[in-house]
């Protein structure tokens, strides 16, 4: 049986038609429900569709030009974006057409039926594509109530038949008007038109009644509507907002009226007509307001003729769905052109804040697609019409009140939560409240606003924010401003004090007496049975055999003889075995039991004897016994070193143990970026290896929130003798003051002078002192050679030593010590010229350069390293065979540490020291080191030592050990005496000096001296006529000595300047006169009636530059209108001016009035004073350490 040509049968499995759900299927279903017409390709009806031929003809005519490209592009994008797409992808038209033909090959049909069906199918694709051309951008399924609806205005543009004024015509799908219609459709249209006419008459009568509504009824109606709107959902259309938003678009642009693409619905037509008539009816009510400004009439006129379509557009944009199309931009531009700037601001104040609160989230173009709204139009039409008039009346009335309030109280604009609010004085609360009423744009009376404010929670944050913003100007213009002015008027010492307070690093102090501290376990020592059997005599003999270990203290544990007796964990012993440590060194044998028992220890041993491992192994056992770290906890173990290189080396020695035990360590030292070190500490670390200065920086950073010392219970000071000298002692004590009182403290060093003992005992409790091999002794494995030779022969001897060494061992390393940084770089250049690859390291270099240099030296990239004493402590290089003291060390401890860089861990090495005949003060320390280590003393060195002792006895020389023993106190005295270098070294380590009263007085004294010198150098403002008389008077007057002569005490530059100026004045007899009998050269045609001079020859170069550079002079010329000329010649200090030559360098100021010349002279005097003070400060400043200069 033949199937009718338009009847529908199930599609084959996998068919694109059966598996695909189109975006506008919901819209088609609704259209089919409304008018009984179906726009799908096939219908379920058994009767044929007579409109296929007409539809095909219209479609071929309209889409002939862009047929192929348009279909192919839109079809691929539509099917890609459809969320319900399940079938195979149709990439092009040919593939789709081939598949479509194959689907119906097995069906019986006539040729004409086939063609019609194929055309109908293609037409169906065209219909599906036409609606989706605009929605490809969104990438979302549209047409449902859950998704943002889209506009089909493109379809309206493509229609050949334009819409009429009443809105009859157009459908939800963009399709061509139908040429033929059934009789039923014609009857339906007639019935709808009849209903429409009846409805119009009804609305006209209602509009006439609304014109007579008084303002009180309008306000009551608005109050009820606001209550309803507050409880409604965000998707419910608010009539009041719709009416308020209606002026958002104007009918001046023709495109909105012509491109309306809504479906043919009498309810939509009724809504549109009602809005139009409501606006027309509201004209008399708006015009009846008295005192309405003329400028408001323009937007009101536009609002009365606005249709429902632009009204919905405003609501959508107010809620965030901004349509950036050409029509909206044109409308906005025209509205701004009609209004002046002031009116535009007011409209922002009164209108915009209300939109985000009650705006509808349904876009205007798809309003008729919402099924829930379609049935409620009739219920809301009367309220919408009434609210439209009331909204216009209320807004205009609010604008009038706002204008009145502005004239009375000149408020300030303050932004609150994206809106613009009016901010008044606190003394006028009522106008401020009224401004908020205008901002909300809801209810005109104040009581209605307050009632609505209590009910609605959305507006409360806005009010709170407004109150907070109001207080800010009050605080800004309060008494604090006058305090600031007083500070500005104060003396310079107050500013210096503020600056120093900001620079000062304060560590938050912790009072452990008020904190409950968890007890910790420190004693892990259990004496092995084999040690407990030893008698006291046997223990004494054992200690004597182990390089003569000497111990002091109570209950000293017996020394161990192998690693298994130390009480270490299995993991630690495995790492020790992997590192190849066969048995403990003498210092380790005695120090490990003492540290494992939780006692404070002072360890003194020769260089290279394994002191680092002696304090690291007990620390790991100590940390593992404590609870794990929490987020805000600081480290448990703290190791402090005097040099950065030593800190890096200790951190490197920790790494093999850290990975095995699951611990973390941070190396913090100056010169490296503190940001990375803070990040590592915040991640958590049980151990921190640091220098004191950087540790203080970390503790003071971020008000002490970076790290803390609350959990530090194991503290190590390596090279402890230097930690309590060299300026470290105050920093170390500041760190110790923030630690727990029950901590365990360990001090290790190769040298420990007796003068330091009293300082070390301050941080120790009942310590055990362990000394191996004596204090300040060079290891016996080191061969010491001391040569007394002149300075020129040193370099040739260095070349000889290097040649002999590298002939024997090409892989050997050589370390050359010098006294000063400049000498290190000079020696580097000379050795490089001789063909020896080498590098230098000293405190004047950046830390990254120092780190890379040490690394390259250890790896053998460069075999020779030239260094100052910064590399004398802790540096451990395996192949270091030769140490050369190019400049002899001036004390014993420095010599021991320099020589101890070689001959480490049982290896042998050579230390060669050059001593010049003039360095008799170095001879006693070097000779003592040779004696203690059993080395022969050269005869010339012994003679120099005796000669120095004679000088000391006679008072001609002073015997020093290299240690002050008083920390900063001693160093401060040296800095004050030298006035140079050590101050900057101290500050670089992190300790800033406080600004004392003496320093303030010095600053004031400097400023006064500079001012006196400038006043003496500047002349008074003289008239042109008085110049000759002054010259004659100067000739006849005898030289008069003034009291301005200053005695040159400390060779201060300011004193020199004052003395020179006073000498000039006493010689010339008049302040500022350049030379007796010499007239001022201001007789040119441009010479002013008044002039003044300012001699600048004897001031510092920076001061002279301040008053002669083009920028400063140009500012003075522009401000005063004077003429400023630099005259004379510059004569260095001490050089007299030849007879008949140009005078000393001075500045000539000329002007027409005395006032302008005096003003210019005052400004030049100020510049000269500032430049002089800056020059003096620059001279008193030293480089990084006072020894290194960049050439």
UniProtKB/Swiss-Prot annotation:
Biological process, per Gene Ontology: mRNA processing; RNA splicing
Residue ranges with Acidic residues bias: 358-384, 990-1005
Segments carrying motif DEAD box: 718-721
Keywords, comma-separated and alphabetical: ATP-binding, Coiled coil, Helicase, Hydrolase, mRNA processing, mRNA splicing, Nucleotide-binding, Nucleus
Biased composition (Low complexity): 236-253
Molecular function terms from GO: ATP binding; ATP hydrolysis activity; nucleic acid binding; RNA helicase activity
Coiled coil segments of this chain: 969-1018
Gene Ontology CC terms, in alphabetical order: nucleus
Annotated spans, Disordered: 1-436, 946-1008, 1025-1051
Enzyme class (EC, first level): hydrolase
Annotated Basic and acidic residues bias: 22-38, 46-144, 185-212, 326-338, 967-980, 1025-1034
A UniProt-annotated Pfam family: DEAD
SUPFAM superfamilies registered for this protein in UniProt: P-loop containing nucleoside triphosphate hydrolases
Residues that, per the record, bind ATP: 605-612
Principal subcellular localization: nucleus
Ranges annotated as biased composition (Polar residues): 422-431
Catalytic activity reported: ATP + H2O = ADP + phosphate + H(+)
Localization, UniProt: Nucleus
Domain Helicase C-terminal residue range list: 801-945
Helicase ATP-binding domain location: 592-770
Motif (Q motif): 561-589
Enzyme Commission number(s): 3.6.4.13
Record-linked PANTHER family: ATP-DEPENDENT RNA HELICASE DBP3 (PTHR47958)
Written domain comment of the UniProt record: The Q motif is unique to and characteristic of the DEAD box family of RNA helicases and controls ATP binding and hydrolysis.
The name this protein goes by in its record: Pre-mRNA-processing ATP-dependent RNA helicase PRP5
Species annotation: Gibberella zeae (strain ATCC MYA-4620 / CBS 123657 / FGSC 9075 / NRRL 31084 / PH-1)
């Amino acid at each position: 049986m033949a199937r009718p040509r338009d009847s529908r049968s199930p599609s084959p499995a996998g068919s694109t038609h059966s598996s695909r759900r189109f975006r506008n299927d919901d819209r088609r279903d609704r259209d089919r429900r409304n008018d009984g017409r179906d726009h799908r390709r096939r219908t379920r009806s058994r009767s044929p569709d007579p409109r296929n031929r007409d539809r095909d003809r219209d479609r071929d005519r309209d889409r002939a030009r862009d047929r192929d490209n348009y279909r192919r592009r839109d079809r691929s994008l539509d099917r890609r974006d459809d969320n319900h797409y399940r079938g195979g992808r149709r990439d092009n038209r040919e593939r789709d057409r081939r598949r479509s033909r194959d689907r119906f090959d097995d069906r019986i049909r006539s040729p004409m039926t086939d063609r019609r069906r194929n055309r109908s199918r293609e037409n169906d694709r065209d219909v599906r594509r036409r609606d989706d051309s605009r929605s490809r951008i969104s990438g979302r399924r549209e047409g449902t109530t859950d998704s943002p609806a889209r506009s089909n205005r493109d379809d309206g543009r493509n229609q050949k038949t334009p819409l009429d004024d009443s809105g009859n015509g157009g459908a939800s799908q963009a399709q061509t008007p139908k040429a033929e219609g059934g009789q039923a459709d014609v009857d339906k249209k007639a019935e709808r038109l009849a209903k429409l006419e009846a409805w119009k008459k009804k609305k006209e009568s209602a509009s006439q009644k609304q014109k007579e509504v008084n303002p009180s009824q309008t306000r009551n109606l608005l109050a009820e509507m606001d209550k309803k709107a507050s409880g409604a959902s965000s998707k419910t259309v608010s009539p009041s907002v719709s009416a308020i938003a209606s002026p958002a678009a104007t009918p001046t642009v023709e495109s909105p009226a012509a491109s309306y693409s809504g479906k043919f619905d009498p309810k939509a037509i009724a809504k549109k007509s009602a809005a139009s008539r409501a606006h027309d009816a509201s004209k008399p009510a708006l015009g009846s307001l008295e005192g309405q400004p003329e400028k408001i009439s323009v937007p009101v006129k536009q609002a009365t003729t606005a249709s429902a379509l632009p009204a919905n557009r405003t609501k959508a944009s107010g809620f965030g769905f901004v349509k950036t199309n050409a029509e909206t931009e044109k409308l906005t531009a025209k509205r701004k052109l009609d209004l002046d700037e002031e009116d535009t601001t007011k409209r922002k104040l009164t209108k915009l804040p209300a939109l985000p609160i009650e705006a509808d989230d349904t876009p205007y173009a798809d309003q008729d697609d919402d099924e829930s709204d379609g049935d409620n139009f009739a219920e809301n039409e009367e309220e919408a019409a009434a609210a439209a008039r009331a909204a216009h009346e209320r807004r205009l009335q609010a604008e009038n009140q706002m204008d009145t309030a502005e004239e009375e109280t000149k408020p300030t604009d303050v932004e609150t939560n994206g809106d613009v609010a009016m901010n008044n004085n606190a003394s006028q609360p009522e106008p401020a409240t009224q401004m908020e009423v205008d901002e909300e744009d809801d209810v005109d009376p104040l009581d209605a606003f307050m009632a609505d404010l209590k009910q609605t929670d959305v507006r409360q944050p806005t009010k709170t924010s407004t109150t907070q913003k109001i207080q800010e100007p009050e605080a800004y213009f309060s008494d604090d401003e006058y305090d600031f002015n007083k500070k500005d008027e104060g003396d310079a010492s107050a500013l210096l004090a503020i600056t120093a307070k900001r620079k000062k690093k304060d560590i938050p102090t912790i009072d452990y007496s008020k904190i409950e501290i968890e007890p910790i376990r420190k004693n892990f020592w259990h004496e092995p049975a084999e040690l407990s059997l030893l008698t006291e005599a046997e223990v004494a003999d054992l200690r004597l055999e182990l390089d003569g270990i000497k111990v002091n203290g109570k209950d000293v544990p017996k020394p161990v003889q192998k690693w298994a007796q130390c009480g270490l964990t299995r993991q630690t012993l495995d790492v020790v075995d992997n590192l190849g440590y066969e048995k403990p060194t003498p210092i380790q044998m005695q120090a490990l039991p003492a540290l494992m028992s939780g006692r404070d220890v002072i360890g003194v041993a020769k260089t290279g004897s394994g002191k680092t491992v002696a304090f690291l192994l007990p620390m790991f056992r100590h940390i593992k016994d404590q609870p794990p770290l929490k987020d805000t906890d600081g480290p448990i173990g703290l190791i402090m070193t005097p040099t950065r290189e030593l800190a890096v080396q200790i951190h490197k020695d920790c790494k093999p143990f850290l990975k095995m035990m699951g611990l973390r360590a941070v190396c913090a030292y100056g010169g490296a970026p503190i940001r990375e070190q803070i990040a590592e500490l915040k991640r958590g670390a049980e151990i921190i290896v640091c220098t004191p200065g950087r540790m203080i920086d970390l503790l003071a950073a971020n008000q002490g929130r970076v790290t803390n010392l609350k959990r530090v219970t194991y503290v190590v000071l390596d090279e402890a003798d230097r930690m309590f000298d060299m300026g470290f002692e105050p920093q170390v004590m500041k760190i110790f003051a923030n630690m727990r009182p029950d901590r365990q403290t360990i001090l290790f060093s190769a040298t420990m002078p007796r003068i330091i003992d009293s300082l070390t005992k301050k941080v120790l409790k009942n310590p055990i002192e362990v000394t191996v091999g004596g204090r300040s002794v060079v290891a016996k494995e080191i061969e010491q050679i001391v040569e007394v030779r002149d300075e020129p022969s040193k370099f040739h001897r260095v070349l000889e030593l290097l040649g002999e060494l590298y002939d024997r061992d090409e892989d050997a390393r050589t370390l050359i010590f010098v006294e000063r940084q400049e000498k290190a770089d000079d020696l580097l250049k000379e050795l490089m010229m001789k063909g020896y690859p080498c590098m230098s390291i000293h405190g004047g270099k950046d830390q990254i350069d120092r780190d890379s240099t040490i690394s390259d030296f250890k790896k053998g990239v460069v075999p020779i390293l030239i260094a100052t004493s910064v590399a004398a402590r802790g540096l451990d290089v395996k192949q270091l065979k030769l140490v050369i003291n190019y400049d002899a060390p001036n004390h014993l401890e420095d010599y021991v540490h320099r020589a101890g860089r070689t001959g480490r861990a049982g290896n042998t090495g050579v230390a060669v020291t050059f001593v010049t005949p003039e360095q008799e003060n170095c001879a006693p320390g070097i000779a003592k080191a040779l004696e203690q280590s059993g080395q022969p003393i050269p005869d010339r060195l012994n003679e120099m030592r005796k000669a120095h002792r004679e000088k000391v006895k006679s008072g001609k020389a002073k015997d020093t050990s290299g240690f002050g023993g008083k920390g900063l106190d001693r160093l401060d005295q040296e800095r004050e005496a030298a006035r140079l270098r050590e101050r900057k070294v101290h500050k670089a380590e992190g300790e800033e000096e406080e600004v004392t009263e003496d320093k303030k007085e010095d600053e004031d004294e400097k400023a006064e001296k500079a001012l006196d010198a400038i006043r003496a150098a500047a002349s008074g403002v003289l008239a042109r006529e008085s110049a000759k008389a002054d010259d004659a008077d100067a000739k006849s007057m005898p030289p008069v000595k003034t009291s301005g002569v200053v005695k040159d005490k400390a060779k201060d530059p300011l004193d020199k300047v004052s003395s020179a100026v006073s000498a000039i004045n006493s010689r010339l007899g008049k302040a500022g006169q350049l030379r007796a009998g010499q007239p001022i050269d201001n007789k040119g045609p441009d010479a002013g009636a008044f002039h003044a001079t300012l001699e600048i020859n004897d001031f510092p170069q920076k001061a002279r530059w301040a008053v002669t550079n083009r920028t400063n002079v140009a500012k003075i010329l522009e401000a005063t209108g004077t003429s400023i000329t630099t005259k004379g010649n510059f004569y260095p200090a001490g050089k007299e001016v030849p007879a008949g030559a140009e005078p000393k360098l001075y500045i000539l100021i000329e002007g027409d009035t005395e006032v302008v010349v005096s003003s210019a002279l005052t400004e030049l005097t100020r510049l000269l004073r500032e430049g002089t003070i800056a020059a003096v400060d620059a001279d008193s400043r030293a480089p990084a350490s006072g020894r290194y200069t960049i050439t």
